[in-house]
Design a protein with these regions (language model features):
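Active-site-proximal helix/loop microenvironment
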Residues: 72-88, 161-205
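Glycine-biased, low-complexity coil/linker segments
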Residues: 11-13, 36
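Active-site SXXK
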Residues: 61, 69, 82-106, 131, ...
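Extracytoplasmic
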Residues: 56-59, 66, 76-80, 84, ...
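A penicillin-recognizing enzyme superfamily signal
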Residues: 138-153, 178-288
Length: 290
């Protein structure tokens, strides 16, 4: 997927390409320093580049400034409408569980198909961090077994998510099924809030899991396509809501850099699993970065 470097205005107002000897900062690093018109030019350039190199309508995306929450670029039909988001809801189910159990998270043995996981052979012994990294359905079935929609309402409000259906319970609250729908825009902002609350109980383990996901979990395709920066990633696969139905749609949310995110990218790819959506997200970030 060839492309020309994405230009970003310098502080002096001229444009610089990735080959400029004076350009030692990445576009992502520059975004945190750029204000006003220059930030707007970055957003315009990002939108043009993403739509040029990823033109297919099978790909939906939202690119946000991680500090302000401003949408920098987007191509997503009705992004304010609630839809199933699959395992992207697992971190918030974990927070809801923590609020009910003093943030003590149990370990669990995932035995694969026999304990309801997507990985037939299972993940073995997992804790919250590794369960997030590998999106272990077995762990989250165990974690949410005693949760009801009412238990999740406070967490949904705290992070600005749509509430699950009143009679949703158990694994439905971990994004398995369609009983907890939320809007793509709302979910993107919920992840930004998760990062802002990184010092709160339970959140650190979740973010550590997202960092591990980007390196060696279900989001590892992000790092393979975009190796120049550490990232936070979470993947998911959910029921397709396109008019042209597929068995499912893949989702990936990525924040870079991991230690102080400057941008968030939420991607949906029609008819593929979440790991493949992570690869698309990594390719998009590589384009923006360079």
């Amino acid at each position: 997927m060839g492309s020309s470097p994405l230009p970003l205005p310098s502080r002096g107002g001229s444009t610089v390409g990735s080959q400029s000897a004076s350009s030692e900062q990445s576009n992502v690093e520059r975004l945190s320093a750029e204000k006003g018109g220059n930030s707007s030019l970055f957003a315009q350039s990002a939108a043009q580049a993403l739509n040029r190199d990823f033109p297919g309508r099978d790909i939906s995306f939202l690119l946000l400034d991680a500090h302000t929450g401003r949408v920098l670029a987007s191509r997503w039909d009705n992004p304010d409408n609630p839809i199933p988001m699959g395992s992207l809801l697992k971190p918030f189910a974990a927070v809801a569980y923590g609020e009910q159990h003093d943030y003590h998270y149990p370990n669990h043995t995932c035995r694969g198909t026999s304990t309801g996981c997507w990985l037939p052979r299972g993940h073995g012994e997992v804790d919250l961090t590794t369960a997030v990294a590998h999106s272990c359905n077995s762990y989250f079935r165990m974690l949410t077994a005693g949760l009801t929609a009412d238990d999740v309402f406070a967490t949904a409000t705290r992070f600005g998510l749509d509430r699950p259906e009143l009679d949703a319970s158990g694994a439905e609250l971990a994004g398995l099924g369609t009983r907890w729908r939320t809007s793509p825009v709302g979910l993107a902002h919920a992840y930004l809030e998760l990062v802002r609350e990184r010092q709160q109980p339970g959140v650190r383990q979740i973010l550590d899991g997202m960092a591990l996901s980007a390196r060696d979990g279900t989001g590892a395709q992000v790092h393979r396509a975009f190796p120049s920066a550490d990232a936070l990633a979470k993947t998911g696969t959910a029921t397709c809501t396109h008019s042209r139905r597929a068995p499912g749609d893949g989702f990936s949310v990525v924040l870079v850099p991991a230690d102080d995110p400057q941008i968030l990218l939420l991607v949906r790819v029609h008819g593929v699993p979440g790991a493949q959506a992570a690869r698309t997200a990594g390719q998009m970030l590589h384009l923006i970065e360079n």
